[in-house]
UniProtKB/Swiss-Prot annotation:
InterPro entries referenced in this protein's UniProt entry, alphabetically: Ankyrin-SOCS_Box, Ankyrin_rpt, Ankyrin_rpt-contain_sf
UniProt repeat feature ANK, residue ranges: 8-38, 42-71, 75-104, 108-137, 141-170, 174-203, 207-236, 239-268
This protein's UniProt keywords: ANK repeat, Repeat
Superkingdom, taxonomy of origin: Eukaryota
Recorded name of the encoding gene: ankrd29
Signal sequence range: none
Pfam (any one): Ank_2
Protein name as it appears in the record: Ankyrin repeat domain-containing protein 29
Length: 298
């Protein structure tokens, strides 16, 4: 968290809030020479700094001195946002006790819930949801709290959100669903949980790629194994290729082998009339691709 300090006294207030120096903070605020809501050029307040830094007693002192809990920084962030982002659950509870709102958004649409989910703070998420946070909160690009948790691999938090009513297939504006993002990032446990909770195994992005296609291209074999348990499409996708083409292009021999064992067809061309074998010079992969053809399986 960066901030610009304006005056020597404001500078001292920010320093005390950041370091958790309660005695100095009280001295400055009681002097009557500095506003409890003094701001820097970004709109940062001492309450935001103390909340971000996790100094409970300083946060309480600032509130008792009349700090406005719901002031927003230039970016839209509030004290609650910063406390949630950093996982300071007791401070989150304290802010709620004195009227913090869950509805404020940053310029990119982020809420305190989104921040807590992105950074995996399950206790904070529980507190936020109990105090009115909307489990369907999403960024301006459509990424939901569940999407952010899936992207970062926070399995227990994902279970928590799904149990609170989060939509497992809610995509981002570009069509990317939580399952697709988890597959891209290689989070096999997340993929497993999402599939068991009803995620569409063949949901595709606007570019036509599916979770299996992306995992195959990245060589995330543990993810592929979870997806293959749910019999995803091995045929031509909307992007004109198959998962086998993706695996070959990605260069993972194990990924290619997994797909062949799942009965992917090495003789199926993409819409450019290219066979998977046309997309690699790897002798090891070419050898594996030839085996089904030699055995008459295609």
């Amino acid at each position: 968290m960066s901030f610009k300090k304006e005056t020597p006294l404001a500078n001292a207030v920010f320093w005390a809030a950041r370091k958790g120096n309660l005695a100095l903070l009280q001295l400055l605020l009681n002097s009557g020479r500095v506003d409890v809501d003094c701001k820097d050029a970004y709109g940062t307040t001492a309450l935001m700094v103390a909340s971000y830094s996790g100094h409970y007693e300083c946060v309480r002192e600032l509130i008792m001195q009349g700090a406005d809990i719901n002031l927003q920084r230039e970016t839209g962030s509030t004290a609650l946002f910063f406390a949630s982002q950093q996982g300071h659950n007791e401070i989150v509870k304290l802010l709620f006790e004195f009227g913090a709102s869950t509805e404020f958004q940053t310029k990119d649409g982020g809420t305190a819930l989104c921040a807590a989910c992105q950074f995996g703070h399950s206790r904070v998420v529980d507190t936020l949801l109990k105090n009115g946070a909307n489990v369907h909160d999403q960024l301006n690009d459509g990424a939901t709290a569940l999407f952010l948790a899936s992207q970062e691999g926070h399995v227990n938090l994902i279970r928590q959100l799904l149990s609170s009513g989060a939509k497992v297939n809610q995509p981002r504006e570009d069509g990317t669903a939580p399952l697709w993002m988890a597959a891209q990032m290689g989070h096999s446990e997340v993929v497993k949980v999402l599939l068991l909770r009803g995620a569409d195994r063949d949901a595709d992005r606007k570019d036509g790629s599916t979770a299996l296609f992306k995992a195959a291209h990245k060589g995330h074999c543990s993810v592929m194994e979870e997806l293959l348990k749910f019999s995803p499409s091995l045929g031509i996708l909307k992007n004109g290729s198959t998962a086998l083409h993706a695996a070959v292009m990605g260069g993972s021999l194990k990924a290619v082998d997994l797909l062949l064992k799942a009965n992917a067809d090495p003789a199926l061309p993409n819409t450019n009339n290219e066979l998977p074998r046309d997309l690699t010079k790897s002798e090891r992969i070419l050898r594996v691709l030839r085996l089904p053809l030699m055995n008459g399986e295609s």
